[in-house]
Swiss-Prot record:
One of the record's GO cellular component terms: endoplasmic reticulum membrane
Protein localization: Endoplasmic reticulum membrane; Microsome membrane
Protein name in UniProt: Cytochrome P450 2C28
Molecular function (Gene Ontology), one example: linoleic acid epoxygenase activity
Enzyme Commission (EC) number: 1.14.14.1
UniProt binding sites for heme: 435
Organism: Mesocricetus auratus
Keyword Membrane: yes
Length: 490
């Protein structure tokens, strides 16, 4: 048979199958734009600003609608009420982790963030308990953050008031806090292993936010057959895992079953206790993936928020001045900030919350999935269907936060200048899959930002009106543009 005819017939069959699958899969799914065969709605979405596209679709189809990424339907939930209903009221039903092909290639479905079922429940329960035992959200970890803040100040002083890119410094500080919990040690800022880890983490976060990776997540075959930045991400992750394995082996050689030093020790002890269980979720591969999850989630997200926060404070000098005035009044210059100060610093607390709200770090959350057939409003969501929850639609809701595109700590202050909580504040998500490092991240952001502003004035190289705070990427995460600044000792 003519090869051209074979190709035409094959493509025709694929198109027919795609059309059949999309039409038969609609059932009682929410409405949405008509998908194209094979590629779905991908051409109707701005890959560089997915949140904007979702907002436009919600105006046409309402707060719950269906998009097709390739041939697979994905339900999108938009707006506070719908997001809360999906993630809290139906938290168990939507507690599955959605499809993320590049990450599945990295960790084989292991770890905490991208695992499912019993594996996820057991590892999350163990990790939460272990992290709490090592002080997450408590005074002991606060001491660790304060010590790291002092080290950060010393490193910033070494810039001698010269212009610098803060990315490296702001990556090291939160990463070292996590290292103390996971590896039982912090690194000097010039340690070669540490520098290599920081480089790999930063590169991978940038790659995950590239438009190319969003295309690969829609058409996973590209990951296997085409060149591209995804190969660099996979190589970087392999190097990170290799380093973790090296540290695991060091821990195994010095392990004291009765005196665990850190997260790795606790996991190794759990492995030993379950060594006779052939179905145990606690294996060496699982340990490496879990440590990678804890390390990546606990460092890159906080460092990016800090970097974005300083950029916003550079642009909004009046906010910086008010925060520094409050710092001088409540803390002074002779002691380190502590978490007890926060209740007496409503404006600073509001500023930290506003940074997180404005930055909107993970705009469309990490994808969820239905663990069973779910009746959601007037629709039936089949088991295994991916769910995108728009956190942008909550954090930038103009009814809760007037002028949401403007950076303004008053969004979290009442008429008397007291701190005002908001149910719409969910940068860590909500429900069963909410970020388990929330308490740690909140402490880090408050203590590190206040310590920096206690010790330094921030000076921009450009006029404040020329400072651009628009993210350079807004796909998986929001990444601030590169910038330099002066840290001027106060």
């Amino acid at each position: 048979m003519d090869p051209v005819l074979v190709l035409v017939l094959t493509l025709s069959c694929l198109l027919l199958f795609s059309v059949w699958r999309q039409s038969s899969g609609r059932g009682r799914l929410p409405p949405g734009p008509t998908p194209l065969p094979l590629i779905g709605n991908i051409l109707q979405i701005d890959i560089k600003d997915i949140s904007k596209s979702l907002a436009n679709f919600s105006k046409v189809y309402g707060p719950v609608f269906t998009l097709y990424f390739g041939t697979k339907p994905t339900v999108v939930v938009h707006g506070y009420e719908a997001v809360k209903e999906a993630l809290e009221d139906l938290g168990e039903e939507f507690s599955g982790r959605g499809n993320f092909p590049i990450v599945e290639r990295m960790n084989s479905g292991l770890g905490i963030i991208f695992s499912n079922g019993t594996k996820w429940k057991e590892l999350r329960r163990f990790s939460l308990m272990t992290l709490r035992n090592f002080g997450m959200g408590k005074r002991s970890i606060e001491d660790c953050i304060q010590e790291e803040a002092r080290c950060l100040v010393e490193e910033l002083r070494k810039t001698n008031g010269s212009p610098c890119d803060p990315t490296f410094f702001l990556s090291c500080a939160p990463s070292n806090v996590i290292c103390s919990v996971v590896f039982h040690n912090r690194f000097d800022y010039n340690d070669k292993n540490f520098l290599n880890l920081m480089e790999k983490l930063n590169e991978n976060f940038e790659i995950l936010n590239s438009p190319w990776l969003q295309v690969c997540n829609v058409i996973p075959a590209f990951l296997d057959y085409l060149p591209g930045s995804h190969n660099k991400a996979l190589k970087n992750f392999a190097e990170i895992k290799s380093y973790i394995l090296k540290r695991v082996k060091e821990h195994q050689e010095t392990l004291d079953m009765n005196n665990p030093r850190d997260f790795i020790d606790c996991f190794l002890i759990k492995m030993e206790k379950e060594k006779d269980n052939p179905h145990s979720e606690f294996t060496t591969e699982s340990l490496m993936a879990t440590v990678a999850d804890v390390f990546v989630a606990g460092s890159e997200t906080t460092s990016t928020t800090l970097r974005y926060g300083l950029l916003l404070l550079l642009k909004h000098k009046e906010v910086t001045a008010k925060v520094q005035k409050e710092i001088d009044h409540v803390i002074g210059r002779d002691r380190s900030p502590c978490m007890q100060d926060r209740t007496r610093m409503p404006y600073t607390d509001a500023m930290v919350h506003e940074v997180q709200r404005y930055v909107n770090l993970i705009p469309n959350n990490v994808p969820h999935a239905a663990t069973c057939n779910v009746k959601f409003r007037n629709y039936v969501i089949p088991k295994g269907t991916d769910l995108i929850t728009s956190l942008t639609s909550v954090l930038h809701d103009d009814k809760e936060f007037p002028n949401p595109k403007i950076f303004d700590p008053a969004h979290f202050l009442d008429e008397n200048g007291n701190f005002k909580k908001s149910d719409y504040f969910m940068p860590f998500s909500i429900g069963k899959r909410m970020c388990m490092g929330e308490a740690l991240a909140r402490m880090e952001l408050f203590l590190l930002l206040t310590t920096i502003l206690q010790n330094f004035d921030l000076k921009s190289l450009a006029d404040t009106k020329d400072i651009d705070t628009t993210p350079v990427a807004s796909t998986f995460g929001c990444v601030p543009p590169s910038y330099q600044l002066y840290f001027i000792p106060r």
